[in-house]
């Protein structure tokens, strides 16, 4: 489990460092690298930290873009990610 978490954090950090984690959405700055603080909640099912909830709120407008991106989709659409978002009191958007 810890190895999987480490791989997730490393993968997101590498993509973000290469500029691949930044996606523009209607003036919003979408950066999947900001969600690395949520790795424990998303990959491991841990309770999201305050920093995680803050990052999720900041990236809320980007959820659909991340969900459609093959690099992040399986994490964003996972039951643990949905649980983390819900625990932070954030409504999941309906993506088209």
UniProtKB/Swiss-Prot annotation:
Keywords of this entry: Disulfide bond, Lipid-binding, Signal, Transport
Q: Does the keyword Lyase apply?
A: no
| Keyword Transport among record annotations | yes
Here the disulfide bonds are 30-62, 38-52, 53-88, 64-95
So which residues are the signal peptide here?
1-27
Q: Which Gene3D superfamilies match?
A: Plant lipid-transfer and hydrophobic proteins
Source domain of life is Eukaryota
Tell me the GO BP annotations in alphabetical order.
lipid transport
Single Gene Ontology MF annotation: lipid binding
Family assignment? Belongs to the plant LTP family. B11E subfamily.
Q: What does this protein do?
A: Transfer lipids across membranes. May play a role in plant defense or in the biosynthesis of cuticle layers.
Q: Which PANTHER family match?
A: BIFUNCTIONAL INHIBITOR/LIPID-TRANSFER PROTEIN/SEED STORAGE 2S ALBUMIN SUPERFAMILY PROTEIN, NON-SPECIFIC LIPID-TRANSFER PROTEIN 2
The name on file for this protein is: Non-specific lipid-transfer protein 2
- Native organism is Oryza sativa subsp. indica (Rice)
List the taxonomic lineage. Eukaryota, Viridiplantae, Streptophyta, Embryophyta, Tracheophyta
